[in-house]
Amino acid sequence: MIEVQKVSLQIKKAKILENVDFTCQKGQICGVVGRNGSGKTMLMKCICGFVKPTSGEIQVDGQVIGKDIDFIPNAGIIIETPGFIPNYSGYKNLQLLASIQNKIDKTRIREVMQMVGLDPDMKRSVKKYSLGMRQRLGLAQAIMEDPSVLVLDEPFNGLDKEGVVEMRQYLLQLKDAGKAIMVCSH
């Protein structure tokens, strides 16, 4: 669950967020919609603990973000454009992520890739992936560790109609599995 309570963010003299308040329960998809530059991405970064709000409090699964330095939210994250090693295949990118976390599970990597509609046996490098395939791989990265919360900034960015429909289906499956999902979009 994500709880945002009276969160404000000011950078220098610019008010980025002012008194933001909402809750996103498990098994729920919540949306943040706004124009470019309206603070959507900064809100997502605050929820993930990358940026400390000027005031207010954010909790993920009952833990206050930023209070306990050892607490890292159990969150899968896509912030704007997912990062990949372009010369590696999608499978190899996920394998590298798993090795960094000391949790290499080849079965899980294959399962996650298939879940988002990618072929784990495809040898093509990520630099040759379409934008839609990269977005799917970004979602695969976000769900690798089976997080309780997903924070997705512009997950439909650059997708065609079919890609948007497929991404929505993946998100509905994750919602039905009890994930709290924050989606930011225009």
Language-model regions: role of each:
Residues 33-35:
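The feature captures the beta-strand-to-loop junction immediately N-terminal to the Walker
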Residues 56-71:
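Conserved ABC transporter NBD signature motif
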Residues 161-163:
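Helix N-cap at the start of a conserved alpha-helix in ABC-type nucleotide-binding domains
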